[in-house]
Amino acid sequence: MAFFQDGPELGNTWAGDRALRECVRRLLPSEVLAEVEPDLERLGERAAGEMLALAVEAERDPPRLVRLDAWGRRVDRIETCPAWRRLHEIAAEEGVVAIAYERAHGEHSRVHQFARLALYHPSSAFASCPLAMTDGAARTLEIHGEEELRERILPRLISRDPEAFWTAGQWMTERTGGSDVGDSETVAAPDGAGGWRLTGSKWFTSATTAEVALTLARCEGAPAGSRGLSMFFLETGMAAGALRGIRVERLKDKLGTRALPTAELELDGVPARMVGEPGRGVPTIATVLNITRLYNACCAAGTLGRGLALARDYARRRRAFGRPLAELPLHLETLAGLAAEHAAALQLTFRAAQLLGREECGVASAGERELLRLATPLVKLTTGRQVVAGVSEVVECFGGAGYVEDTGLPGLLRDAQVFPIWEGTTNVLALDALRAARGGGALAALEREISGAVEGSGVALLAPARSAVRECLAQLVAWHSLASRDAREALEAGARDFSLGLGRTWAASLLLSQAEWEARGSERAAAPAVEAARRFAATLGAIPVPRAASPGAGATRDLALGGAAEEVRAPALR
């Protein structure tokens, strides 16, 4: 068959992503930017070349579980391909984790790190996933770890030397527990020598080749529920080539992230050490979750940016109706909408990274610390929804080619679906956002930030956008105030709409700040940022207003469960 169409090509991912570049330029001081930007451009070239080729190879050669050796001994060895292992080495070389702990640029180190992560992730075949947990474990050991762990383990988790670099797992999900971690069944028994032995099942572990892990378990005799859980550190045995008290039951056959080994594990007397106080496992491991959720947001924004880059390039190559797609007004509208969503996701992510950096360096105000607590679930849940809708639109931009596996585009969509699931689903995070808003301090801090952003007046075109943000914020704050006085069911029922509305309203305000900042240099050069802010703010009118009525009233329940209460019968379990 004759050749008929050029496929999309990927250029330097730093040079080609204006929204990312300008966001980072606004947040970093000029002297820091001058130091790090050349290296970001170099990484952007590496991501589009060497790393992309490795990622394609890793996707084609997924991990395998070898249960037995040639002599029948059970070894439970997970084999990954050379390309996957090389991507891990590149992460160490590029300091994707290390930068946050070297803190060469103080409070700005997290922004620098997240810029690197946004470039690294889309060409990593999800090697970024173990990095998220490694970063979270490093911070947890930095805060809560005993001196021996800080001296022996922490340097490996933040090393730039591929030979010394270790990754860490975060094993929380169990068959019964899931998001309800208080239902976890793993038990910790004293080993008689000051340590512990863990026994239980971990149903979903995504860093199964990690050298170390943090996990939750219930000490013998501890009370039921989350308050009975403690956090433990363990060495898997991977560093020595053989698992210690761990059986790999199977690798998961997943919708996406297929290069990433994900497994069900059985813990059978695994040696472990408690980290933090007994019964404080959930608050202690929250340090990991706060970081992995922001990684999730950054990787979601990066994935959306990758899809947008491919769609933009294809629009210049593909001709339809006698013209390139890039000259068709309706296609340009579609791409512009995607670009606005991508810019919004970046703004949310990097504002959270900025807050995290300030908190870690001890310079955050009390209000900023409260804001970070609310930002973490808001940013994760908002970007998780954005990337699924956005990448679905990207696939559609390619027509039938987007539905063909060997273009690689269906894999982009499959992978995107993980972002609203990993590290807490939308509903779980919406409830967490409600908890963060309890007491009013965090919500008041966010309200002040958004209100401050809409006070700008330098760009006349943004006046309608500022009004839209003010109106949406007022509605959301008013709903929260009223619902907080109502029954708990009403507050929970509206949590999703409230959190998504708040996240998108915040994103719109950040886009306004970005556009105003760019316009100070040149209104003409700021045109893309102004248009992104204008377009995104226009979507706020479509945000559902949270319902104040309790679903227990009946109608919501009947609709949700498929009939009147007396008609709904659960199927018998067999």
Named regions from a protein language model:
Residues 145-194, 350-369, 376, 387, ...:
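Internal maturation/activation junctions in enzymes
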Residues 416, 420-458, 499-516:
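C-terminal catalytic subdomain
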Residues 452-574:
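C-terminal amphipathic alpha-helical interaction region
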Residues 240-245, 249, 254, 261-292, ...:
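A glycine-rich, basic-preceded beta-loop-alpha segment at the flavin cofactor/substrate interface
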